Each structure stands twice: as structure tokens, then as C-alpha cells.
């Protein structure tokens, strides 16, 4: 993958990233003030895609910027295709619901599926398409995002003000 300790900025060209493990494009150690990295601080980072054609196939998160992921057309309209994990949403089936209620004077219904079997796997990997701890900001672009978990994820704010998303 691509990792920028301060930041990652793509403003044109064609970028193809494929990883079997880890994030496709990542930045996690930068504080940005007035469009420049002013100080490298642990746990901070910006990924800015301002143009170009970007294709990411990642074993974990597709694009991850701790502080922000910014997608804008300040250079040219970007085209972005991201596949995180297998690209197929992770779903699970329910275990059945409650049975019906008995009529007047009847008995309460029984659980529709009384098999309390459970299969659980613990996997700490994050398989999100575009992720930030603070801000995902989409102003423009053509985005095609497929992921096992959230396509767009932020612990604080996801902002859309343009773009075509599939």
C-alpha cells in the first residue's frame, strides 16, 4: 500500500494499489494547518484525493486518514474505485423470532427457534471502504466503493456535498 507519515495527496495521474493485508492508502501522523503539515503528531493524518484515477484493492481498509479523508476536484474531478476485503457486505442470519400469541384463554407462544446455537468468530480487522477517525469529506468525484463493513465511516463526521457515489 501507500503510507504517508505526514499526509498523502493525489492530484492527478493514475494510481493503482493492491494489498492482501493492511490498508490500501493510509496516513496517520500529521496535523494540517492552512493547507500544510505543520507538525508530525502521533495518531494524526490526512489523505487528500484532489484529482486523478485511483483504484484500491485492500486486505483491510481501502483508504484511511486518521484526521481526515478529503475528496475534492481542486485539480480535476477524481475517479475512485475502492474494494475493501472481499467487497461483499458481511451479513448474518437471525435466529428466529417469537411464536404467535395464543387466543383468549390460550397459552403464550413459544420461541420460534429454540436452538440457542451460536457461531462466532473474532476478527479485529477493519474492512471499511473509506475511513477516518474524525472526518470523511466528499465534495466531488466519481466514487465506486465496495466493502465488507461500512463504505464510508467516521467516528465523528461524514460530509457529502457533491460527487457521484455507487
What residue ranges belong to the model's regions?
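A composition-driven surface/loop motif
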Residues: 1-166
Amino acid at each position: 500500500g501507500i503510507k504517508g507519515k505526514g499526509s498523502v495527496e493525489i492530484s492527478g495521474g493514475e494510481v493503482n494499489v493492491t494489498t492482501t493485508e493492511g490498508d490500501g492508502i493510509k496516513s496517520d501522523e500529521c496535523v494540517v494547518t492552512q493547507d500544510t503539515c505543520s507538525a508530525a503528531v502521533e495518531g494524526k493524518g490526512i489523505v487528500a484525493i484532489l484529482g486523478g484515477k485511483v483504484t484500491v484493492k485492500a486486505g483491510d481498509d481501502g483508504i484511511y486518514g486518521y484526521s481526515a479523508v478529503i475528496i475534492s476536484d481542486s485539480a480535476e474531478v477524481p475517479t475512485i474505485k475502492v474494494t475493501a476485503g472481499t467487497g461483499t457486505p458481511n451479513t448474518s442470519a437471525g435466529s428466529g423470532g417469537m411464536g404467535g400469541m395464543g387466543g383468549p384463554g390460550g397459552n403464550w407462544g413459544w420461541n420460534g427457534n429454540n436452538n440457542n446455537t451460536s457461531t462466532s468468530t473474532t476478527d479485529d480487522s477493519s474492512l471499511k471502504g473509506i475511513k477516518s477517525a474524525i472526518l470523511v469529506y466528499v465534495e466531488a468525484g466519481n466514487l465506486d466503493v465496495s466493502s465488507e463493513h461500512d463504505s464510508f465511516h467516521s467516528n465523528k463526521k461524514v460530509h457529502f456535498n457533491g460527487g457521484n457515489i455507487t
